[in-house]
């Protein structure tokens, strides 16, 4: 049996402001830093250790990983930073308040943009300053692979090459792997691992800063998965994530 640990970054400044974030590189709040420290403490107390970690190229995930490493005394851990683990790109919604957007377009439309599998939000214009083309962190990524908007289907297609070419081989080799990423890049991976249908994935909500443990068989098929921590608090956090895109 293999174990894989996933963690969504701690609360970011735009999580706190209920704004669509996507590829915008916002930082953690004080609460987000505390969530990351607590995640590291939970993992340490439960006896976990790691051989390698994967994260995105966005600071809220990177800093979450730092805090987990710090609390676990694993600052030496090899880390792979990949744009493929970035949050889903929210296109022209990037920076908008979710509740205000729902009030303007309706709860149902915003739910489709946030959680449906194959309907992306309106795209950014290529000349928009939020477009990734001139960002140095993507200088080595072919321009045609850089998104101006994404649906979850696009995010799955972006994440899976990293899983197949690097993460899965690391797990199979016996390495203890930690992935610190984002709500939708983790939803994309979980959809693949658990075989969740395109319709059912709408209901999957991942709380900030809570370790999610996957136990996998020899074929890397899930045996079971579970969150570490106070289960009632985790359920409340998941419900709060689900409510973020509603007008009222």
From Swiss-Prot:
Binding site for substrate: 8-15, 21-22, 60, 87-90, 98, 114-115, 183-184
Site residues, Transition state stabilizer: 182
Name of this protein: 2,3-bisphosphoglycerate-dependent phosphoglycerate mutase
A GO BP entry: glycolytic process
Record HAMAP family: PGAM_GpmA
Function: Catalyzes the interconversion of 2-phosphoglycerate and 3-phosphoglycerate.
Keywords, sorted A to Z: Gluconeogenesis, Glycolysis, Isomerase
Keyword Isomerase: yes
Family: Belongs to the phosphoglycerate mutase family. BPG-dependent PGAM subfamily.
CDD domains: HP_PGM_like (cd07067)
E.C. designation(s): 5.4.2.11
Species for this entry: Burkholderia ambifaria (strain ATCC BAA-244 / DSM 16087 / CCUG 44356 / LMG 19182 / AMMD)
Gene that this sequence comes from: gpmA
Catalytic activity: (2R)-2-phosphoglycerate = (2R)-3-phosphoglycerate
Molecular function as annotated in GO: phosphoglycerate mutase activity
Record-linked InterPro entries: His_Pase_superF_clade-1, His_PPase_superfam, PG/BPGM_mutase_AS, Phosphogly_mut1
Record carries keyword ATP-binding: no
Residues spanning the signal sequence: none
Highest classification ranks of the organism: Bacteria, Pseudomonadati, Pseudomonadota, Betaproteobacteria, Burkholderiales
PROSITE patterns per record: PG_MUTASE
EC class: isomerase
Quaternary structure (record): Homodimer.
SUPFAM superfamilies noted in UniProt: Phosphoglycerate mutase-like (SSF53254)
PANTHER family: PHOSPHOGLYCERATE MUTASE
Catalytic residues, chain numbering: 9, 87
Pfam families named in the record: His_Phos_1
Pathway info: Carbohydrate degradation; glycolysis; pyruvate from D-glyceraldehyde 3-phosphate: step 3/5
């Amino acid at each position: 049996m293999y174990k894989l640990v996933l963690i969504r970054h701690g609360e970011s400044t735009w999580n706190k402001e209920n704004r669509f974030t996507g590829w915008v590189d916002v930082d953690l709040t004080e609460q987000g830093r505390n969530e990351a420290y607590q995640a590291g403490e939970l993992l340490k107390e439960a006896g976990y250790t790691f051989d390698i970690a994967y994260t995105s190229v966005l600071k809220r995930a990177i800093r979450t990983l730092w805090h987990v490493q710090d609390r676990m005394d694993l600052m030496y851990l090899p880390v792979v930073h990949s744009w493929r683990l970035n949050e889903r790109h929210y296109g022209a919604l990037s920076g908008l308040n979710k509740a205000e957007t729902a009030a303007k377009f309706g709860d149902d439309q915003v739910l489709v943009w946030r959680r449906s599998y194959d309907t992306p939000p309106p795209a950014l214009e290529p000349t928009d300053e939020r477009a990734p083309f001139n960002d140095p962190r993507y200088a080595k990524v072919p321009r045609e692979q850089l998104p101006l908007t994404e649906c979850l289907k696009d995010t799955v297609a972006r994440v899976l090459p990293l899983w197949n070419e690097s993460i899965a081989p690391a797990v199979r080799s016996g390495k203890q792997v930690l992935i610190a990423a984002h709500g939708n890049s983790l939803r994309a991976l979980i959809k693949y691992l658990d075989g969740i249908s395109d319709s059912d994935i709408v209901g999957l909500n991942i709380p900030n800063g809570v370790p999610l443990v996957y136990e996998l068989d020899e074929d890397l098929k899930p045996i079971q998965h579970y969150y570490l921590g106070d289960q009632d608090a985790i359920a409340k956090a998941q419900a709060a994530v689900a409510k973020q895109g509603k007008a009222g």
